[in-house]
Regions:
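Metal- or metallocofactor-binding catalytic centers and their adjacent structured scaffolds
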Residues: 58-142
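Short, Gly/Pro- and small/polar-rich lid/capping loops
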Residues: 1-56
Length: 142
C-alpha cells in the first residue's frame, strides 16, 4: 500500500508537562497548579497542558493510518529530550520525515524504524516522541 500524503495536527495529551527543575527549586503547588518561575527552556509556566502531534498517513486506497507523538511529563529533565511543543516539531516532521514516506510503499515496519533512528537534525536523533508516534502509524498499516 503506497503512502500518498502525511498530515500533522496539533493535539493534547491526557496530562501535563511539568517543569521538574522549577518544582525542585520551590515552585508552590496549589491543587492542580504550580506557581513560580520556570527554569527549563521552553516552559511558559511550571505546569502547562501536555501537547502531542497526531501524524496521519494517507494511503492510496483512502485509508488513514495515524500515530500520536507524545512525550513524558518531565520533558527536558534528567537527560530527557526537550519540551515537546507541536509548533516546534511539526516543521521537523514535515521537513525530514514526510519526504522519506510519501510515495513509498508501507510494507516494512522494521525499515521505517531504521529510517527514523538514522535521521539526524543538527547532529541529533529525532525527538523520542516523534520516533514513537511515527512508528505507531506505520505499524497500523503494515
Amino acid at each position: 500500500m503506497k503512502i500518498v500524503d502525511l498530515v500533522c495536527s496539533k493535539a493534547r495529551t491526557g496530562f501535563f508537562f511539568d517543569d521538574q527543575r522549577a518544582i525542585k527549586k520551590g515552585a508552590v503547588s496549589d491543587g492542580a497548579a504550580y506557581f513560580g518561575e520556570t527554569v527549563t527552556p521552553g516552559f511558559k509556566s511550571v505546569r502547562q497542558a501536555g501537547e502531542a502531534i497526531s501524524v496521519m498517513l494517507i494511503l492510496e486506497d483512502g485509508q488513514i493510518a495515524w500515530g500520536d507523538c507524545a512525550a513524558v511529563q518531565y520533558s527536558g529533565a534528567g537527560g530527557r529530550d526537550p519540551l515537546f511543543l507541536a509548533e516546534d516539531f511539526i516543521p521537523i516532521i514535515e521537513k525530514y520525515i514526510k519526504s522519506e514516506l510519501v510515495g513509498k510503499e508501507a510494507d516494512s515496519f522494521k525499515g521505517l524504524c531504521e529510517m527514523l533512528e538514522n535521521i539526524q537534525v543538527d547532529g541529533k536523533r529525532l525527538h523520542t516522541a516523534i520516533r514513537y508516534g511515527v512508528s505507531q502509524d506505520r505499524k497500523s498499516v503494515v
